[in-house]
Amino acid sequence: MDMKHTLLEALGIEIVENTAERCVAVMPVDHRTVQPFGYLHGGASVALAETAASAGAQNLIDHTTQACVGLEINANHLKSVKEGTVKAIAEPVHIGRTTIVYHIHIYDEQERLICISRCTLAVIKK
């Protein structure tokens, strides 16, 4: 899949592990992902969470007839980050015929939990 000219490229998001059981994505905390006070922007964390869930869901669908799209996402931001890299670990908690739900935990470089998210994806026909 070509990531050129996408939000992933703009934010520096990389998928580092992607299986049916979990997807791990990383993102730098830099000028692209911080808010004006220098802290990681909550929206960037949500983009990372949805990216990890959406990428993971690709392992669970039939690509010839189905696609996954975001239906709902929420996030609780628990700790702030000013530098380094953050890592999202997305694991499916419900794999249904029309929806897939992921829990996503985002950690800083010291493995401190900084964000908890839940993302519901709709499984649609192509």
Swiss-Prot record:
InterPro entries with a match to the protein in the record: HotDog_dom_sf, PAAI_dom, Thioestr_dom
What is the superkingdom listed in this entry's lineage? Bacteria
Q: What class of enzyme is it?
A: hydrolase
What is the E.C. number? 3.1.2.-
Identify the keywords attached in UniProt to this record, alphabetized: Hydrolase
- Family, per entry: Belongs to the thioesterase PaaI family.
NCBIfam families registered for this protein in UniProt: unchar_dom_1 (TIGR00369)
Q: What is this protein called?
A: Putative esterase ComA2
Source organism of this protein record: Bacillus subtilis (strain 168)
